[in-house]
Swiss-Prot record:
Keywords: Cytoplasm, Exonuclease, Hydrolase, Nuclease
GO cellular component: cytoplasm; exodeoxyribonuclease VII complex
Catalytic activity reported: Exonucleolytic cleavage in either 5'- to 3'- or 3'- to 5'-direction to yield nucleoside 5'-phosphates
Gene: xseA
Protein name (record): Exodeoxyribonuclease 7 large subunit
Gene source species: Campylobacter lari (strain RM2100 / D67 / ATCC BAA-1060)
Source organism superkingdom: Bacteria
GO terms, biological process: DNA catabolic process
Pfam families linked to this entry: Exonuc_VII_L, tRNA_anti_2
Lineage of source species: Bacteria, Pseudomonadati, Campylobacterota, Epsilonproteobacteria, Campylobacterales
Top enzyme class: hydrolase
């Protein structure tokens, strides 16, 4: 018997024997397909099942369901032949009440908000040019690799990155995250990024832990919560000092790039020139005024006294200007050193190679034998084949 024959037979048996089923549970994951079909996972306290509600049926549902909704479904069990995965085909849907996860989330959110853990006045600020940043996430996560890649593209090599490994899913995750936060707080960091890529409501629920929230609030180091995707909200987002919609967005929000450094230098230079011109104009007007007063005096003694005062003011002007020039010269030297440090990083980055397959970036571990790839540097690109 072929695999396709077995799957077809199993599908027929399931649809024949389980053709009219009432099913209740909570949505933990849902995808609204462009075709209009709804694909979602329904779960209870022990298990979950993949479900589908085709457009022909869901058009009669008044409200589109979302993660956390409790549903009563009616339909039948079938099997997707291509993968051999069995699923529940919903023909009718009735929303009942908030799911357990959503109810717990809202209750904890209300409790902590009343205690002031979300108070905007309690938020700690993050420096514009950080020197030391901690990242708490799983060492093996794709989110970490994306963040490190984006940091390298920022061309900002003045910041030391310290990574703290932690579980980001499951019952043991809150304690693991708390331990990592406490450890990171002992370092002299400018900020801590708490990061985790996208996942289902259940996958991200460890970031809705009360003890974790209180730990974040108690830290002396500012915390950035970068959990899931932009539509995902967890308790750590509300209690943290800054919320980033994604891990990659956290890097964009915290790390300056070469352009911002150059803009900062240009702004400082323009401010310096403007202040110098204003000082010169002010003292020149004062000198002109004193000279006019001196000319108006006919008595030699009065003229002599005014001339003495003018000499004194000129001496003061010279001292003030010298002090200002020295101050701004020191600032310009500091920025020149900063740009010189960046130049070494830019020169090294020219030798970096980017792997592409079918016009898209690809990581080395995803390549397989026979793949045709393109090796791209800043100045040129070459095609190659994996042997």
């Amino acid at each position: 018997m072929k695999v396709s024959e077995l799957n077809l037979k199993a599908k027929s048996l399931l649809e024949f024997h389980l053709d009219d089923i009432e099913l209740s549970g909570e949505i933990s994951k849902i995808t609204i397909h462009g075709s209009g079909h709804w694909y979602f996972d329904l779960k209870d306290e022990k298990s979950s099942i993949a479900c589908v509600m085709f457009k022909g049926f869901n058009q009669f549902v008044q409200t589109q369901p979302k993660v956390g909704d409790m549903l009563d479904l009616r339909g039948y069990v079938s099997l997707y032949e291509a993968s051999g995965r069995y699923q529940f085909i919903a023909k009718s849907m009735q929303k009942t009440s908030l799911g357990d996860l959503e109810a717990k989330f809202l209750a904890l959110k209300e409790k902590l908000e009343k205690e002031g853990l979300f108070d905007i006045n309690a938020k700690k600020s993050i420096v514009k040019f950080p020197k030391k940043i901690g990242i708490i996430t799983s060492f093996t996560s794709a989110a970490l690799q994306d963040m490190l890649k984006l940091i390298s593209q920022k061309e900002y090599n003045l910041c030391k990155i310290t990574i703290f490994n932690a579980l980001t899913q499951g019952q043991s995750a809150p304690n693991s995250l708390i331990n990592a936060l406490k450890k990171a707080n002992e370092y002299d960091l400018d900020a801590i990024i708490l990061a985790r890529g996208g996942g289902s409501r259940e996958d991200l629920f460890c970031f809705n832990d009360e003890e974790l929230a209180r730990c974040i609030f108690s830290l002396k180091t500012p915390v950035v919560s970068a959990i899931g995707h932009e539509i995902d909200y967890v308790i750590s987002d509300f209690v943290a000092d800054l919320r980033a919609p994604t891990p990659s967005a956290a890097i964009d929000m915290i790390f300056p790039n070469k352009l911002s450094l150059e803009q900062g230098l240009d702004e400082l230079t323009m401010r310096f020139k403007s202040q110098m011109l204003n000082h010169l104009k002010f003292y020149q007007n004062k000198i002109d005024h004193l000279q006019n007063l001196a000319k108006a005096k006919s008595l030699e003694n009065a003229f002599f006294l005014r001339k003495q005062k003018l000499d004194f003011l000129q001496s003061q002007l010279k001292s003030v200007l010298n002090l200002k020039l020295l101050n701004y010269e020191n600032k310009l030297n500091n920025f020149e050193e900063l740009l010189a440090q960046h130049k070494n990083f830019f020169d090294k980055s020219k030798n970096l190679i980017n792997l592409q397959k079918d016009g898209k970036n690809i990581s080395l571990e995803k390549l397989k034998k026979g793949d045709i790839i393109k090796l791209c540097s800043i100045n040129e690109s070459k095609e190659a084949q994996i042997l």
